[in-house]
Amino acid sequence: MSKINLSTMWSSFIKKIAKTILVAIACISLFLTSSPAANAYPFWAQETAPATPREATGRIVCANCHLGAKLTEVEVPQSVLPDTVFKAVVKIPYDTDVQQVLGDGSKGGLNVGAVLMLPEGFKIAPEDRIPQEWQEELADLYFMPYSEEQENVLLFGPMPGDEYQEVVFPILSPDPATDKSIHFGKYAVHAGGNRGRGQVYPAGNKSNNTTYNVSASGKITDITFEEYVGNQITIETPDSETVVDLVPPGPELLVAVGDTVEAGQVITNNPNVGGFGQADTEIVLQDANRVKWLMAFFALVMLAQIMLVLKKKQVEKVQAAEMNF
């Protein structure tokens, strides 16, 4: 009986191990086969620049893959008080009538993504701190911190661009009274906004959303198209060697059989209709006591002005009385 139980347990254990291995293989296969068609959106920045998405030059790393330049805007209040919730808005405008080249070469709508870099201590507001009137506006939005150590750097997307050309981040300001590492003052805010797929993947290889060049000089002797693979351009060089260049589905060829080309010559159009842009602004973490003292100062100045006016009128009355006398 004991042998039968052990045999059954061992068989069950082997099946579980096999199942786990198969699932792992399937996941790895899915990852490897789908990555070439994946969109290069903000989360790729975590892979290429895990420490910070902003380079020493001030450029956000998303620009390394999204080579087209487009407008992005960021709006934050001029100043905020400690431990308060406010809106930071990143605007990613584009023409919603255009369509981009997808991974398989077909056309489709553009997605958008955003990176918001706030001062240290600022972070996404907890759900219980978000005002009720904001709930509907923020219902379908999901934000992700850049890393566990950087809650002040936030990622959004990809999401459908025709619905999210304005992304509202509900932000909670820090309180220097409870966190001694935070200080009142003026701070920089950086934002990046992307629409559409990138032209280069983080590994450096091209996507099918960019231009393609020939690798050798010579005469094009053949062009063959294979679905899901693309166009194979056969070039006969002056040395009678044969070179075959591959252009994936998406870009349109600008050459034909019989054309003579030079090495490095662009042989496709540029299908990219999207692009990346970044914007910088400032926000002041304001001390409430300073605001109170400032208001008191203004009140004192106004009172002094009123007293001066009254004093002036009093002097004028005295002067008028002396003249009559």
UniProtKB/Swiss-Prot annotation:
Superkingdom of the source species: Bacteria
GO BP of this protein: photosynthesis
Any one Pfam family match given in the protein's UniProt record, by short name: Apocytochr_F_C
InterPro entries assigned: Cyt-f_TM (IPR024058), Cyt_f (IPR002325), Cyt_f_lg_dom (IPR024094), Cyt_f_lg_dom_sf (IPR036826), Rudment_hybrid_motif (IPR011054)
Membrane topology (UniProt): Single-pass membrane protein
One term under GO cellular component: plasma membrane-derived thylakoid membrane
Keywords attached to this entry: Electron transport, Heme, Iron, Membrane, Metal-binding, Photosynthesis, Signal, Thylakoid, Transmembrane, Transmembrane helix, Transport
Gene3D superfamilies noted in UniProt: 2.40.50.100, Cytochrome f large domain, Single helix bin
PROSITE patterns: CYTF (PS51010)
Keyword Methyltransferase: no
Cofactors named for this entry: heme
Cellular compartments annotated: Cellular thylakoid membrane
UniProt entry tagged with the keyword NADP: no
Cofactor note: Binds 1 heme group covalently.
Function: Component of the cytochrome b6-f complex, which mediates electron transfer between photosystem II (PSII) and photosystem I (PSI), cyclic electron flow around PSI, and state transitions.
Protein's name according to its UniProt entry: Cytochrome f
